[in-house]
Amino acid sequence: MFEFITDEDERGQVGIGTLIVFIAMVLVAAIAAGVLINTAGFLQSKGSATGEEASAQVSNRINIVSAYGNVNNEEVDYVNLTVRQAAGADNINLSKSTIQWIGPDKATTLTHANAADKTTLGEEFNTTSIKGNNDNVLVQQSDRIKVIMYAGGVSSKLGAGDEVQLTVTTQYGSKTTYWANVPESLKDKNAVKL
């Protein structure tokens, strides 16, 4: 009923073959585990980076506090925005921001002007500090910076009833949109709320 193997050579060969198969399986399992651990670490770091970028785009925004236009010969020649940090935002450098201008007769993207002369703006905008110590960077939520755009340099000056969509994109990629609406009458005005 039971068979006994008495030959020592055969018994050793079967044991070595089994041992080789076992070692091969352990090596394959170890390599697979290493690949899985590396992949999991890579995916975790990618997920973390994506989460941080998404968080920055949502939280590192600006708020537009007010907007007004300078009136010259019954046309708005300068559009001025007063901006501040949104709640919970990091420092926002407006010199690294862009403004998309979609106006009555032209759409373009404005970049920050490097010129010290704020009156010669073309398709650029400039900034000046209202409250705070920096003309370009919003450091605290109490800081206020005026963003100046020359409508005549972008396209034509804005007339009564015109509308401009302004979208400010910060260096983090967050966007804030403001609709500047020129009042129906500009007669005898020096400045108007937009």
UniProtKB/Swiss-Prot annotation:
PTM section of the record: Glycosylated.
Residue positions assigned to the propeptide: 1-12
Record's subcellular location: Archaeal flagellum
Biological process (GO), any one: archaeal or bacterial-type flagellum-dependent cell motility
InterPro entries (UniProt xref): Flagellin/pilin_N_arc, Flagellin_arc
Alphabetic keyword roster: Archaeal flagellum, Glycoprotein
GO MF annotation list: structural molecule activity
Domain of life (superkingdom): Archaea
GO cellular component, one term: archaeal-type flagellum
Pfam families (UniProt xref): Arch_flagellin (PF01917)
NCBIfam families: arch_flag_Nterm (TIGR02537)
Family: Belongs to the archaeal flagellin family.
Functional description taken from the UniProt entry: Flagellin is the subunit protein which polymerizes to form the filaments of archaeal flagella.
Protein name, entry field: Flagellin A2
Organism of derivation: Halobacterium salinarum (strain ATCC 700922 / JCM 11081 / NRC-1) (Halobacterium halobium)
